[in-house]
């Protein structure tokens, strides 16, 4: 029997130091007919800006920059221990900084200048991970990454001559502890049995009820779903981390690590996978959702501007120096380049029209370095802006845009909204494959700007989609995955996509799948729902072949607790050392 069910789309505020979104609702409602058994919820109260503004930062339990000093002391002490040990005697320390329980340092001081290599020996059918710096020295300090929890891990140090000839090896056993009981472990739907690669899926599954208080964890999963890296959950989690250079990664700093009592983070940190924090930079305004590492070494970060009643419509370009504050070189206000259209499904949809009109959730730089793209969820638009801050193009359904934006709207080759081409809706995670091909995570929210033609959840879907953008401002859809799964993968509020050139494959994080307790599909309904997340790697072929599928889900019908994943990064544990 058909029922009327109230659909209220949330405007989500994802803080840099949080792994969940705090979402506000507006009071007006509209209805769609839904044939699922989703529960009907009462209308929420009318919320004001005070309800959705980011909470105050609170007090700091420890000045964040002392963390760098503490970690430097730990590292220097380990170097000293290696140098004072007997010559050619390995020294090891698991989780040296208390932040990465599946990582270690090993060191050895040789009697003459040599090269050293560390090899992590896997079990049957598992890849062997190895790292060999080019440095010739007597004191070797090597990161050991990709260990298993609660396991006697076999590690080998191989010494090479200055010319690279193996001279001898040392075998070590590193016994790791079990991970925290609360650490989420995926159900493995499909996993590789052979032809393994070294990459891990770095994700932050958060357990909780809807968008309420979450219990986040940041972990790295191999292609069998085994956890091979983890961040200490007592220090929080980061929703996003990306490999940078010299072994370092960049990440939004977890709130607990910063010593904060709540609120969203203003900190970007550089760390390595052994857990050492190398640098921390503070921004003037809140950091959120995404950052891109640019070809010139700078970073572009989604942030808030100084306006008191606008959020998530600004990007800064910053140089990372040895000073404690971000050196901001450029600021882009989206309102200066883009004339907005009425928000998706009009203002009744609860998108906080005065505050969160754009909702920037993704940034990437074109491989040529001439322009950047910015994903605006609440405009269902991916916007390209040239380096001189002029508008280049808009990837969006053409309905509702001001006339001045018409010349910039990409025009599809192939029939609009057909089997050959579909627009993206509420999208996340723009990723360039090359200068002309762009991936998006197409969340699919309603697939319309009007309720009369909106797609209800039980008929909807989310996709990984690849577009080709031509120089004449035409656009083609050249590849996709997800529509064939229907509502089973419908994730209306978060998600991500990444292209893996090494294997010509695509990884999708369907991280915000929304259902009710009984497992029926739902949009974000009156603020309460149950999350599930799928991490899926597929071949970049037509049709795509599923290579790996890992699921985080709570099927207990007596609880609303589930799992969400904001986004993911796919990389070998040693990839930052080769950048």
Report each predicted region and the residues it spans:
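Low-complexity "stalk/linker" and mucin-like segments enriched in Ser/Thr/Pro/Ala/Gly
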Residues: 85, 125-131
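Short beta-strand segments within Ig-like beta-sandwich modules, predominantly Fibronectin type-III
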Residues: 131-137
